[in-house]
């Protein structure tokens, strides 16, 4: 086990150190664990690796990426932003509404894509009023990060949780007779919106925005809504006993997302009498993230086979004792702190089996249901990214947009918004989760 743990730590550090090569480092790690299995260090075969890959998650992610690209191209997000801003009295309300819009979109769309959709509107408003766009875009970024955990389709980490724990789209709203994580995220969002409203309390300049953007195609919006509807409907399908139908059942969410994406791309090709939209849609997919997840599935299965996951679960159990509240607080605090500096995708992927293992050790070894701890992990890992400029991809994207537009973004500018925003969201979100699930 020592060799496996050393290899895992080495490859994890490499993923943090060379961000641009993360997928290839993870793939190398997966290959190393397969080699150890081949050499007989522990039982891990190529067939085991293939079974470890959650193709439903990968298909779902790829399909959502493609549909979101078509949604952005339709210019519907910019139109929505203009419609909303046209009805607000001043800058304080404009920033709050943009943050709300970014959060709403991010519950169903990738966080970075959300920033790319909403940021241009924030920039335009700031320029018209001769304000610094820095706090405006930071508010948009942190709001999109917050809402990513609200639904199964909102963020890569949510999709990872759904795949690992067998949760469907509806489980994020209501599960086992209790409110799902969606409601805790929304309560956290209300608290953090109050923080934004207070931070922008002096920005009372009137806003005059005309609705100018023309939506080029309504179908991508319909496809996005249909994707959400079908994901919910798929949650209620009965599980077949076996055979091809069972295989299709295990891939149902991925097939829904990918099928609607391909339909949208094919329709765009038909409208333009060209294959260019199909090529552009496939170019828009984030192949780095897809390869990273593919590799992590194999790497973490190898780590588990070597006994590292069980050892980590024992360590957490020793630190928290047999008290669920202690474990919950430890997971939330550790996730917030670590995700402020490291990417939350590999962190959540690595921690999900650990959380499952710790839950099995609780209650004197009889085990308890892990859902509270899964949600606590996801809440902390998602919100922790808002503490620092490098804690989440959406933050990096927003800062990149600002710098391309000649703005200087200082760390203290980000912390002034990110820290109180995160503290409010974590305290209310994690607190309500405990009220729903822990008592």
Predicted segments with their positions:
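Membrane-core helix-loop-helix motifs of multi-pass transport proteins
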Residues: 125-221, 365, 369, 374, ...
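Residues that define the loop-to-transmembrane-helix transition and helix capping
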Residues: 23, 56, 92-93, 134, ...
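Peri-membrane helix termini and adjoining interfacial loops of integral membrane proteins
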Residues: 32-43, 75, 159-167, 203-204, ...
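Alpha-helical transmembrane segments of multi-pass membrane proteins
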Residues: 91-104, 130-147, 172, 177, ...
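Membrane-embedded alpha-helical segments and adjacent helix-loop junctions characteristic
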Residues: 47-134, 289-364
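Re-entrant/interfacial helical elements at transmembrane boundaries that shape
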Residues: 80, 113-124, 137-138, 151-167, ...
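Hydrophobic transmembrane alpha-helices of multi-pass small-molecule transporters
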Residues: 1-73, 79, 175-314, 409, ...
């Amino acid at each position: 086990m020592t060799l496996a743990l050393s290899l895992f730590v080495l490859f994890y550090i490499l993923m943090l150190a060379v961000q641009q090569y993360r997928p290839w480092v993870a793939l190398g790690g997966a290959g190393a664990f397969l080699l150890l299995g081949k050499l007989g260090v522990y039982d891990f075969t190529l067939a085991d690796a293939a079974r470890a890959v959650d193709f439903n998650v990968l298909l779902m992610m790829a399909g959502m990426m493609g549909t979101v690209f078509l949604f952005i191209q339709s210019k519907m997000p910019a139109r929505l932003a203009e419609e909303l801003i046209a009805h607000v009295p001043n800058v304080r309300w404009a920033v709050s509404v943009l943050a709300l819009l970014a959060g709403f979109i991010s519950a169903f769309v990738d966080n970075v894509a959300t920033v790319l959709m909403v940021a241009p509107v924030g920039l335009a408003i700031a320029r018209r009023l001769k304000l610094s766009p820095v706090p405006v875009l930071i508010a948009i970024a942190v709001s999109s990060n917050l809402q990513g955990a609200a639904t199964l389709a909102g963020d890569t980490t949510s999709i990872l949780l759904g795949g690992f724990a067998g949760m469907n789209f509806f489980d994020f709203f209501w599960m086992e007779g209790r409110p799902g994580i969606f409601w805790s995220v929304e309560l956290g969002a209300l608290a953090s919106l109050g923080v934004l409203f207070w931070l922008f309390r002096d920005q009372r300049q009137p806003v005059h925005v005309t609705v100018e953007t023309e939506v080029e195609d309504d179908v991508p919006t319909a496809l996005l809504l249909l994707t959400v509807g079908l994901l919910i409907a798929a949650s209620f399908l009965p599980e077949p006993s076996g055979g091809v139908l069972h295989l299709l059942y295990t891939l149902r969410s991925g097939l829904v997302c990918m099928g609607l994406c391909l339909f949208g791309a094919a329709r765009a090709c038909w409208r333009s009498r060209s294959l260019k939209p199909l090529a552009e849609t496939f170019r828009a997919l984030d192949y780095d993230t897809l390869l990273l997840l593919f590799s992590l599935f194999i790497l973490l299965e190898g780590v588990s086979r070597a006994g590292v996951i069980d050892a980590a679960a024992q360590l957490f159990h020793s630190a928290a004792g047999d008290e669920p509240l202690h474990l919950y607080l430890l997971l939330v605090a550790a996730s917030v702190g670590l995700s402020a500096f490291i990417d939350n995708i590999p962190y959540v992927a690595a921690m999900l089996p650990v959380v499952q293992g710790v839950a099995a050790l609780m209650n004197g070894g009889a085990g308890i249901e892990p859902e509270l701890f899964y949600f606590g992990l996801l809440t902390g890992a998602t919100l922790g990214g808002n503490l620092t400029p490098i804690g989440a991809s959406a933050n990096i994207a927003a800062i990149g947009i600002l710098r391309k537009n000649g703005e200087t973004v200082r760390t203290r500018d980000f912390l002034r918004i990110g820290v109180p925003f995160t503290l409010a969201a974590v305290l209310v979100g994690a607190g309500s989760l405990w009220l729903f699930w822990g008592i």
